[in-house]
Amino acid sequence: MKLAFLFPGQGAQAVGMGQALAERFPAARHVFETADRALGYRLSDLCWKGPIEELRKTVHTQPALLTHSVAAWKLLDAAGVKPSWVAGHSLGEYSACVAAGALDFEDAVRLVHRRGELMYRAGLDRPGTMAAILGLERTQVEEACARAEGAGVVCPANLNGPGQVVISGERAAVVRACELARGMGAKRVIPLEVSGAFHSPLMGSAAAGLTEALAAVSVHDALIPVVANVSAEPLRRGVEIRAALEAQLLGAVRWEDSMRRLIADGAQGFVEVGTGTVLRGLLRTLDKSVPSWSVDDPDGLQATVSALAGAAGGVPLTGDSEPMEEAG
C-alpha cells in the first residue's frame, strides 16, 4: 500500500503529548531528550506536565508538536511502516521535512523554536487575528476578503477542505470579512485564539527572520517527495524545499489541494503522525473511502503497525526488536 504521512500543526497541542510513547519506547524518549538538549530547556516537562498556558505559547507549541511527531515517526519507521510521500500542515511541514530527510531533527527543532519567536514578535509589531469560516466555497471566502480590504489586510490563510477556510489579517478587516461571510450564508464563523495573523502579509518581519535562520542550516534533497503547503506540489530538491519553507509564513496553506494531489498521485492510505486527529478529520471531508490511521500514543501505534506493517513490508511491533523495545 502506498502511504502518505501527514504531520499536524498548531492547535493540536495538549498536556501529556508524547508522554506515553516516551515512557514505553526508548527511541521516542531519545527524541524528546535530543530536543531538550538542542533547545537548552526541558521541553519534555512542558509537554508532559504543562502548564497548558505555557504550552500554548507558539515558541513552545511549535517544537513540542515537531518533537512528538518525529518521535512517532521514528517508531513507525523502525517497524517498517514507511511513506511514499509526506505533507505537514503549516508547522507540520517541518516535521514532514525531517521524515523525508530534508532537515536534521536538531536543526528543525531549533528552527521551529526560532519560527515561534519570530511569529510572536511579528504579531506584536503588526497585530492581527484569524477566523475559521465554515460552509462557504473557497471563492466566496476570497470574495468576502476582497470586499473587506477597505478595512485593512485580510486574506485566506488555510484552505483546509470543502467548506472550511481560515482567514487571517488585521482585526478590523477580519471582523468585516466575517460579517460579509455570514451574509453570504456561512454556517459558522469561529474567531481563533492566536497571537498573530499567520500566513498573511502581516508576517513579513517573521518571514525575513526565518529566511536568515534557514540560511544557517542545511536543507538536503529529500528522500521522498514533500508536498509543499504553498503550491500543493511534491518537492524533492533541497533548494525548492527551502524556498517553500521561506514562502510559507506569508502564503496560504493549500491543504485541500495537497490532499487531492496525493490521492491523484496514487496515495492509498494516510497516517497522521503526532498529536491529535485533526488532519484525518479534514481528509474525511474530502474522501471518506480513503483509509487512514493516526499515531498519537502506543495504542494508535500498535493499531497502525498491525494494519500496515505487512502491507508495507515491515515487521510486527514487539518488545523484542531493538528499535522498538519497551522501556522498563
Label each PLM-derived region with a short phrase.
Residues M1-V141, R188, L192, G269-A303, ...:
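FabD-like malonyl-/acyl-CoA
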Residues Q10-A12, L39-Y41, A100-A252:
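Alpha/beta catalytic cores of group-transfer enzymes, especially the acyltransferase/condensing modules
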Residues D77, R182, I263-G266:
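Non-catalytic positions within long, well-ordered alpha-helices that form the structural scaffold/packing
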Residues G251-A267:
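A short, acidic, amphipathic alpha-helical segment used as a generic capping/interface helix at domain edges
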Residues T318-G328:
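Long, low-complexity, intrinsically disordered segments
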